[in-house]
């Protein structure tokens, strides 16, 4: 029982995300996008299993398969990153690649983009593009690139989209 309790505690502890790294990534994003940063409180970063993130995000029914590498929880100003890369991703650079993507969402939120989009999925377009640019510019593994078809589909609103504007 103690082993499981310790795992539970460790699984939800904030990671000591290097503030310098986060600020450097934010600088990269602001130089390569319309988003601005004016010393707002940085989000905390925590590690979770993909399974737990899927349960958190899909309260009713978790899709099978469920492939989530991370997400930004704007209400609590928190970023969650998977404890290990998805099958299609490379170990090396995984954390940075997900962190830059979620920091784009952080900047979208503080810049009011959540209120401007037709649905939350529209927010993914910039996040995927900036993430892929970062991967290229910092010579991270090409295996970290987003699949173009997936990125396009994940960025499109449809008539069944119940996320609405307001971000996530």
Model-derived features: positions:
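Soluble non-cytosolic domains of exported or imported proteins
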Residues: 19-20, 89-98, 117-125
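Active-site scaffold of zinc-dependent metalloenzymes
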Residues: 58-92
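A metal-dependent hydrolase signature that marks the N-terminal structural subdomain at the beginning
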Residues: 9-65, 69, 168
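Sec-dependent signal peptide recognition
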Residues: 1-7
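Substrate-binding clefts and substrate-entry loops adjacent to catalytic sites
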Residues: 82-89, 107-117
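Short, low-complexity, Pro/Ser/Thr/Gly-rich segments in the mature regions of secreted, periplasmic
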Residues: 151-168
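Post-HExxH zinc-binding segment in Zn-dependent metallohydrolases
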Residues: 118-152
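Active-site recognition of the HExxH zinc-binding catalytic motif
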Residues: 97-110
